Curated annotation (Swiss-Prot):
It comes from Caenorhabditis elegans. The keyword Acetylation does not apply. This is Nuclear hormone receptor family member nhr-218. Orphan nuclear receptor. It is found in: Nucleus. The gene is nhr-218. A zinc finger (NR C4-type) spans 20-40, 56-76. GO terms for molecular function: DNA-binding transcription factor activity; RNA polymerase II cis-regulatory region sequence-specific DNA binding; zinc ion binding. CDD domains: NR_DBD_HNF4A. Pfam families: Hormone_recep (PF00104), zf-C4 (PF00105). GO terms for cellular component: nucleus.
Length: 391
């Protein structure tokens, strides 16, 4: 059922791209009753939620709104949203999740969806500008790094995991209840680059085309990051993760995620706060009461964590690869399973390990099932940070 649902979301990627009815970049689904890209959907939501009042930058009220323009006039963009039929009541009905489908195979402008920019070129957090081309260049550099691979693919992935976590503190960590907007930007970009670095430790991933690499990264980094963060958090904080919603975000910082979002939502009125909390609470339940608790009970080894991380990646990759790459990917994934078997037999001296594997796959399936919902946490954080920056 999950695979069938995912295939349904994936189908638009295999057909001719449909342009956004507002800006003409590639759309990502129906948002507020109109086929739009993620950026235009986010812009429309912010405009309504904040009651924004715009002025035409040319004072003619007829500015061009399409992919030929680098910076859109906000008034004319909003007017075009209304003219195309975007409905304000859709915010009340379903609190549009910004994107209901997975993005397709990218050209460079679409790749900016990795950082969810408002104008597909750059985005602003509290006055800080970060262009997607800078991030894209960094990711491409990471993908270009040559790795030495061993006869054990799972050990290679573990080495990648050790590399990205090598500077993480294990003691004397501050637990914050609010996040500086610049830090939030840095955290997010750091997780994207960490995921990219880890992926390069897969010999199979490195054999794919750049387009396939970028598509896989773009579609998996957010859920991959949550499993990575929760596994490290449970290792450091134990039961505090489940009971107090404490999550490790970077090398030195952990946060009380509930208090952080309460702080982020503070400028909203009570009604809008309740709406956002109503949507976020089930997602926090999945991450902390389900996934984190299962991790706490399982206490996975480092190799087991890396096996689960790959399963999340393969869940996406097997839907988008051609027949030859799919066959090679299946062989690679089978080799990981063989390495895991050897880990149980030779390292842990377990003769019966089926129950551990079932528990691991239960964690993976929980994250797979709620893949798009988990992405909403990132969308909400970004949207409200952009909202404050505009103010």
């Amino acid at each position: 059922m999950v695979a069938s649902s995912f295939q349904h979301h994936l189908e638009p990627m295999l057909t001719q791209p449909i342009p956004c009815q507002i800006c003409t970049y590639q759309s990502h689904g129906v948002n507020f009753n109109v086929m739009t890209c993620r950026a235009c959907a986010a812009f429309f939501r912010r405009s309504l939620v904040c009651g924004m009042r715009y002025h035409c930058k040319t004072r003619k009220n007829d500015c061009r709104i399409d992919s030929t323009e680098r910076h859109f006039c906000r008034l004319c963009r909003f007017q075009k949203c209304l003219q195309m039929g975007m409905k304000a009541e859709k915010i009340q009905q379903n609190r549009d999740p910004i994107s209901s489908t997975f993005p397709g195979t990218s050209t460079e402008p679409e790749l900016s969806e990795i950082v969810d920019p408002e104008n597909e070129k750059s985005y602003i957090f509290h006055g800080t500008l970060y262009g997607f081309k800078s991030l894209l260049a960094e990711v491409r550099y990471i993908f270009s790094i040559s790795r030495n691979y061993s006869d054990s693919p799972l050990t290679d992935l573990e080495n990648g995991f050790k590399l990205i976590t090598r500077h993480q503190k294990r003691r004397y960590i501050d637990i914050e209840d609010r996040i500086n907007f610049q830090n939030l930007t840095d955290f997010r970009l750091g997780h994207i680059k960490n995921c990219a670095t880890w992926l390069t430790h897969s010999s199979f991933f490195q054999s794919l085309t750049e387009t396939e690499n970028l598509l896989i990264l773009k579609s998996t980094w957010h859920v991959w990051s949550w499993l990575e963060l929760l596994s490290v958090s449970v290792e450091i904080f134990g039961n505090q993760v489940c009971e107090e919603k404490i999550v490790f975000l970077s090398e030195k910082i952990a946060v009380d995620i509930v208090k952080v979002f309460r702080y982020i939502l503070k400028p909203l009125n009570k009604q809008e706060k309740r709406k956002v909390e109503k949507e976020l609470n089930p997602i926090f339940h999945i991450l902390f009461d389900d996934v984190a608790r299962k991790l706490q009970n399982l206490k996975p080894s480092s190799l087991e964590i890396n096996y689960m991380l790959w399963q999340l990646v393969w869940f996406v990759a097997e839907k988008v690869l051609n027949e030859d790459n799919l066959r090679h990917g299946e062989q690679y994934t089978n080799q990981l399973a063989s390495d895991l078997h050897n880990h149980y037999k030779n390292d842990l001296h377990l003769e019966q390990y089926a129950q551990r594997v079932l528990k691991m796959m239960a964690i993976v399936k929980s994250l797979q099932k709620h893949l798009m919902n988990i992405h909403k946490i990132i969308d909400y954080a970004d949207n409200f940070c952009n909202l404050f920056a505009m103010k």
